[in-house]
Amino acid sequence: MEDGRSTFKVIIIGAGVTGLTLAHCLAKACIDYVLLDKGIVAPSFGTTITLQPHGCRILHQLGCLDAVLASCDVMSGAQCRDPSGKTFASNDFFRVVKKFTGYDTRTLDRKVFLRTMYEQLPDQSRVHERARVEEIIEDNEKTRVVLQDGQEFVGNLVIGTDGVHSKVREIMWDNANTAKPGMITVEEKRAMVTQYNAIVMACSPVPGLGSHDMEVTSNDKFSFLLLCQPDWISIIVHNKLPEDQQCTWPTRRRYTESDMEALVSRILECPITETVVFGELWKRRLKAQMISLEEGVLEHWFFGRIVLAGDAIHKVTPNSALGGNTAMEDAVTVANTLHTLLAAHPNKKPSTVELQDAFRDNYQNARMDRVRAIVKVGGDLTRQQAYDGWKRYLIQRWLTPIVGLDTLAKNIAGLCVTAPKLSYIDFEEKRGMLNWQDTVAADKELEMHHENVGGVRAEYHKSKWLLTSADWSGGFEAVFPQILGVLMVMWSSVWLFHLAFSRHCISGFGGEVWRTFGADNETSCVAK
């Protein structure tokens, strides 16, 4: 009899972070696949990818981690700075995250990461470059992908990992609205919004900047994010767009060198730290480009025999460094879903209905809440770090140092340890003070099995210091808002008292608010 896994074929479209990770996952599951990309593997555009601990765990499981780590160094501390470059919060951020998860946080050139993932594939002949998709035709249990040059690929499932401007998504939308008119609404098509753009660049090292640190420098409606490595620095300048320049799909902003230079000219003199201004980074730039920052989550992640993953269905702003890692989570969950479905019926290929049921329950519905929370975390961080409104200014400038970056690091760790891994590969994962949620669940299931077999009741105890991921399953939202709420009430009471009894209310805390947002602002740089 034929093995369903060996005869079922997946066509992956898009050889970015999601597509290459998925290719590795399918190879480990012995599921046949091809990977198509309209361009080349590892293009030069883009700057970096930051691998959070859960991304590193996935790479560890796939056997790619050592090769990736050979091309990058660890991250260590973090500093938050005001418009003058002065520090108002700092800690060993990434060391704290590692303490709770067991894995480092790494940042490396995106091109190097993609090239490494490609070279680690067991069969590179499955990857086809310059394969631009023209049409996807579903015919009973098969799908045909037709390229612009007339070449065709036939499989049983298409997975679109072709990014935020996905061609596969547009085809899926058309198929869905043809079969079920009104299924994909205008609201969903416009769910990804662009309110910020960014300059993404890399430069050579600058004296005065740490070689393993993250620097966040806030300004009025823009911010600088630096990820420093010994040989280079990754920089992202997040810039709030005027309302008349904000947009949704299908508008796609394309920026020229002149557009980028215009923004640079307004921020050239802005401090990054107390000893470095942005102009010094710009002079040392190795590459730079200006891009739109889309953000949002779509409702429908599949239809028929087409499934979407990664930026094609959700997009997060880069401040949280969760976008690529969330895409890798998608790849893992898609592979787990397929592996489970094919293993349950090893002698036949699943029907379209069976595929849709599996991806609805085990992929779309299972991940929707988590992905929405991640996108919200990224958006909130972008706006807080850019002082986008007085409430966000208060959170970033005044509540962050009170709450402490250790709390933020712990919550990032909590978000990491609730991420998925492949269900069909055993490996010795690293562990920290927080246990990985899926590992804890598997251990408990095994223990319950032993109970049933041996009639022995196991008692589970949580160490005061060894917390399970359930304690942090809400990520940022588990602790941060409650603390902020209490602090806001406390601060409001003090501020009202100050207003009522002081004739010099614009001083101290209030003075900084006035200086940051006032018309006579002389200390902060403003990009309009």
Curated annotation (Swiss-Prot):
Keyword field: FAD, Flavoprotein, Glycoprotein, Membrane, Monooxygenase, Oxidoreductase, Signal, Transmembrane, Transmembrane helix
Cofactor entry: FAD
Annotated positions binding FAD: D37, R110, D311, G324
UniProt entry tagged with the keyword Glycoprotein: yes
Keyword Transmembrane helix: yes
Enzyme Commission number, as recorded: 1.-.-.-
Membrane topology of the entry: Single-pass type I membrane protein
GO CC terms, sorted: membrane
Knockout consequences: Impairs the production of depudecin and accumulates an epoxide-containing metabolite of slightly higher retention factor than native depudecin.
Pathway noted in the entry: Polyketide biosynthesis
Molecular function as annotated in GO: FAD binding; monooxygenase activity
Compartment(s) where it occurs, according to its Swiss-Prot or TrEMBL record: Membrane
Family under the similarity heading: Belongs to the paxM FAD-dependent monooxygenase family.
Protein's name in the database: FAD-dependent monooxygenase DEP2
Organism the protein comes from: Alternaria brassicicola
